[in-house]
Amino acid sequence: MKLTPTKLKLLIEEVINEAAKGAQDLPEDVYVKVFEYRNRIYVMFTDEAGEQIDPVDLDTGEDNPVWGEVSFVEEDRKNPCDKSAVIAVTEVSDGWGPFLYDIAIEIATKRSNGLTPDRFIVSPQARKVWDYYDTKRDDVESFQLDNEEDSFRNGKQDDCGQESSRRDTIINGGEWSDSPLSRRYTKESTILDSLGDKLIWEL
């Protein structure tokens, strides 16, 4: 079978779909902790006591299947970004990135005006997730942000750094505004509501 660009895109979407996890997939001893530290909001996998889960079990030396965190700042330091929060750091085990992103978007929707990707560098894996939000997720809304130069000439309120979007066009083509990294995203709190006693909320 010849692997055309269209077929490759479909395969990538299938992998993302299959790998993505939900609250029902959390191991019995894994929880989700949400807290603020040094002006960042953290969404982190922890144990029942709220202690961070490391990639490797220090007692056994074996890999932990579920670990990681997503953090974001509630406002960009340089640009308004339409009052959206901005991703800061993402480190997460395979298959669990979209789950933590979903929660981060839900929190940012409640507290800010949604969430936008890192404004400078986004990994290829994270870029696929944002593209999936932008094109395939009916439960996630995307809103176009302007660039630092107010290219849309609609005022500065939605101006946002677009370095990651411009970098994206080098690989994927198009204009910076075609990139899924150029937008902010909002989502209803369905994942947060589904966590029940698995959620350790400290905001």
Each predicted region: which residue ranges?
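Terminal substrate-recognition subdomain of acyl/acetyltransferases
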Residues: 19-38, 44, 65-79, 109-203
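Conserved donor-binding loop and adjoining core beta-sheet/short helix segment
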Residues: 46-91
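Alpha-helix boundary/N-cap detector
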Residues: 3-7, 99, 186, 190
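Conserved acetyl-CoA-binding loop-helix of GNAT-fold acetyltransferases
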Residues: 92-109
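Basic amphipathic recognition helices
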Residues: 83-87, 98-103, 115
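Catalytic cores of nuclease domains that cleave nucleic-acid phosphodiester backbones
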Residues: 38-39, 50
